[in-house]
Amino acid sequence: MKKYERIRNLREDSDLTQMELGKLLRISQRAYSHYEAGTRDISIGVLIGLADIYKVNVYYLLHRTDVKEMLPKVI
């Protein structure tokens, strides 16, 4: 699996375009396309935004786990 293939799969499964997702993240479509292509590293802010949009944990996006569910918040 490519570096950021999961973000493309999640976007497609959610029926979102790169343009729509860019607007949600307040970045350009071009910047977002670089993330999906793996030609630019995703900033922590965008990574957190993606996790919030898709309701998955950041580790899933980074291929550190196959568990999609968000981790419980620690108080």
Predicted regions and their residues:
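DNA major-groove recognition helix of helix-turn-helix/homeodomain DNA-binding modules
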Residues: 26, 45-60
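Short, conserved catalytic or interaction motifs in soluble domains
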Residues: 37
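A short, Lys/Arg-rich alpha-helix, primarily the initiator
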Residues: 1-13
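Short, charged recognition helix plus adjacent turn
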Residues: 62-75
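Short alpha-helical DNA-recognition segment
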Residues: 15-34
